[in-house]
Amino acid sequence: MEAYIRQKRATPGMVQASDLQLVRPMSGVNRNGREVHAYDGPMQFMMSPTNPDQIMPTSPVGPVPTVAVGGTGPNVTATSITTTPTSPYSDSTMEKLTPSSQDSEDEESTPVDVLPLPASTKSPANGGAGGAILYDRPTVDGHHLLSHSAPISPALNNNNHTHHTNSSSGNVKSSEDSGTPPSGGGGGAPDTEGDVIGPIEQWVTQPAAQGVLYKCRITRDRKGMDRGLFPIYYLHLERDYGKKLFCLAGRKRKKSKTSNYIISCDPTDLSRQADGFVGKLRSNVFGTTFFVYDSGTKNDAAAPRLDLAVVIYDTNILGFKGPRNMTVLLPGMTEDDQRVQISSVDDQQGLLDCWKSKNMDNVVELHNKTPIWNDETQSYVLNFHGRVTQASVKNFQLVHDSDPEYIVMQFGRTADDIFTMDFRYPLCAFQAFAIALSSFDGKLACE
């Protein structure tokens, strides 16, 4: 079964990360004229002042060495490799990493980068925190992306990450910066890594702050009598030194005509009656359309159920090989960064109804970023900037058509049951987690 799964992931329909270097096995240090510059020892020391692999949040950028590996096969050249100086922290303050965190932290520590946009006309903000300067967002068909006046995507300086693919030779060259997240506004300041503010129950439903990147991890638990068919998914917010904070858990209901996931802040009680119940994800019969609702009830006039997202997967009845195509609909944002309340309880007023009738005034439409075919690997590739390490049909990045370099969300596999999930404004943790769960669910008309 494991060999079959590995063979399936190697099919052309899988989406691979384009920023991974090709690893070729070598039986000796020097053979056939090869010369490898490396140090003999484990690839991750314990946290100590002499740890060459340690990455501190405030580490300055060191000199720019160049490492070249010669021989047959494609050439891979890395420049601007950062070196970490002696840690200013003492050994007593460092947390001892577990083997599992050591294996996955190095490849998942680089945040998502975005590319610069053309200069936009500045307009002062009337709302938002701290009187921040807002920029006029580009429009599509006369409609703004987030609101009447929303901040433009982060802009990068000349030293930030860019990725190029040479289609003629297949050689891939990557030039990376120190791993600092890109700016969340027009001032050039880098994105800060987000953390939980306030109670978990409230934070998971609040839209992400502008200029903040939230890096999360989803684990799938398939242990137990019935978890092979009904696994439990856990969402954790990643922190420094391999630490993580539990945020949400989700599981498919057993007795339901369609796929129906209960999402809760309490991992021990995944039911609608639980105090930690946040909302649910429900699909249609064919598994092509998924609806994300909050914790409200359908027939409650005082607190009606709100539509938080709709995920639409393009049908693939003929079975063509290739990545999935998906459309995500979100409620629009006001000038004070709050969601517009949209409810499908009212006839023809839900997110899907507005999208079908082309009434997009209060709706944000996102699409998955189109992967690029790589002739060398014979697969579709996307640049996940080190956050995704395994090919999977589930890997995707969400962008808006007017700003395709501002990655609102990305999701991908790093192990058999471990996935990374990063999201930004205007998504919240609950919306992003529900969108990721829709990728796990089986789709009769999409595979």
Swiss-Prot record:
Residues 71-92, 157-169 have a biased composition (Low complexity). The gene is king-tubby. One of its GO terms (cellular component) is nucleus. It comes from Anopheles gambiae (African malaria mosquito). It comes from the Eukaryota. The keyword Cytoplasm applies. PROSITE patterns: TUB_1, TUB_2. GO terms for biological process: protein localization to cilium. Keywords: Cytoplasm, Nucleus. Pfam families: Tub. Belongs to the TUB family. Its main location: cytoplasm. InterPro entries: Tubby-like_C, Tubby_C, Tubby_C_CS. Residues 71-196 are annotated as: Disordered. This is Protein king tubby. It is found in: Cytoplasm; Nucleus. The lineage of its organism: Eukaryota, Metazoa, Ecdysozoa, Arthropoda, Hexapoda. Gene3D superfamilies: Tubby Protein, Chain A.
